[in-house]
Swiss-Prot record:
Record-level GO cellular component terms: cytosol
Names of required cofactors: Mg(2+); Mn(2+)
Quaternary state and interactors: Homodimer.
Reaction(s) the record says it catalyses: (2R,3S)-3-isopropylmalate + NAD(+) = 4-methyl-2-oxopentanoate + CO2 + NADH
A Pfam family the protein falls into: Iso_dh
Xref: HAMAP family: LeuB_type1
Name of the protein this chain belongs to: 3-isopropylmalate dehydrogenase
SMART domains for the chain: Iso_dh
NCBIfam families: leuB
Family: Belongs to the isocitrate and isopropylmalate dehydrogenases family. LeuB type 1 subfamily.
Length: 358
């Protein structure tokens, strides 16, 4: 019998975080009632709110709560109020990065879906955007050039700097398996992004991904160089299902995927570790300029909650129900001003419309 009682650490954070989190919790209440499972949610301070209350962006009490939870639902952190602090003490670097490191969150999932009702919001040409697309960017988050040896030396004309791209077989294999497992829940197609024509690390990447693919005969695998991937995302994004990327390539391409949808307020993300424990958050920021005005788009937070249900709590049917309700609400023209400028819907209106469709 599958588990029906879960513990979730809710970290709403700053700016629009509390507003969009409240909307997501309304949706979680509706879907948990429908499917008969219980979500025990504990709310804890994070980011600027935690600095104000506890003197640091990531208090130990919050870390402990996360350790005792099945998943973390994260809102947004940061704002002008805390920009005077040293960089490592500011909300973003002082909370999100340490959480990722503490829990070994090496797998970043960034879905990018263009709903038919929003095809005109996409910056892509109409004949391309009208086809729609549904892409999942799987990015390795803790290895590669961002974490390799780096430094500077010399002076004047002889001054130089270097960064080192390094990947181990183990790091590549575990992210590849996540991509193939994710593809099984989708359209069973993985495209591995590399630069194997010039980079030694990409040669190993391609070799390991090929080996892992043998354990997933039902999943189609193809390869693409990163420069071509950047072009094809603009030319024909509908050809992709799961994009498997290293840290650097995934950092760039996941933002491109996000931008061609037309609204960051629609895009969720997940960061997972080896055991499936994850941190789920909207792809956008804390947007302090619109905080408290009731116009923040809650859909990215709501879809992040759906990802949590799917990947950490094993409630895929509940996740699909949320995603379907979101699509239906948007198709009916329900949305905040960032996607429907003249519709007049508030954050709470959007949440209510989605709940009504569950």
């Amino acid at each position: 019998m599958s588990k029906t009682n879960y513990s979730v650490a809710v970290l709403a954070g700053d700016g629009i975080g509390p507003e969009i989190m409240a909307a997501a919790e309304q949706v979680l209440d509706a879907v948990s009632n429908k499917f008969g499972f219980t979500l025990n949610r504990e709310h804890h301070a994070i980011g600027g709110a935690a600095i104000d209350k506890h003197g640091k962006a990531l208090p130990q009490s919050t870390v402990t709560a996360c350790e005792n939870a099945d998943a973390i639902l994260f809102g947004a952190v940061g704002g002008p109020k805390w920009e005077h602090l040293p960089p490592d003490e500011q909300p973003e670097r002082g909370s999100l990065l340490p959480l990722r490191k503490h829990f070994g969150l090496f797998c970043n999932l960034r879905p990018a879906q263009l709903l038919p009702a929003l095809s005109t919001a996409s910056p892509l040409r109409a004949d391309i955007s009208e086809q729609g697309f549904d892409i999942l960017c799987v990015r390795e988050l803790t290895g590669g050039i961002y974490f390799g040896e780096k430094g500077r030396s010399g002076e004047g004309e002889n001054e130089s700097a270097f960064d080192t791209q390094r990947y181990s077989r183990k790091e590549i294999e575990r992210i590849a398996r996540f991509a193939f497992e994710a593809a099984k829940l989708r359209s069973s197609h993985v495209t591995s992004v590399d630069k194997a024509n010039v980079l030694a690390s990409s040669v190993l990447w391609r070799e390991v991904v090929t080996e892992v693919s043998k354990d997933y005969p039902e999943v189609k695998l193809d390869y693409i160089y990163v420069d071509n991937a950047a072009m094809q995302l603009v030319k024909q994004p509908s050809q992709f299902d799961v994009l498997l990327c290293d840290n650097l390539f995934g950092d760039i391409l996941s933002d491109e995927c996000a931008m061609i949808t037309g609204s960051m307020g629609l895009l969720p993300s997940a960061s997972l570790n080896q055991s499936g424990f994850g941190l789920y958050e909207p792809a956008g920021g804390s947007a302090p300029d619109i905080a408290g005005k009731g116009v923040a788009n809650p859909i990215a937070q709501i879809l992040s909650a759906a990802l949590m249900l799917r990947y950490s709590l094993g409630q895929d049917e509940a996740a699909r129900t949320i995603e379907k309700a979101v699509a239906e609400a948007v198709a009916a023209g329900v949305g905040t001003p960032d996607i429907f400028p003249n519709a007049g819907y508030t954050t709470n209106d959007v949440a209510a419309a989605i709940v009504a469709r569950i």
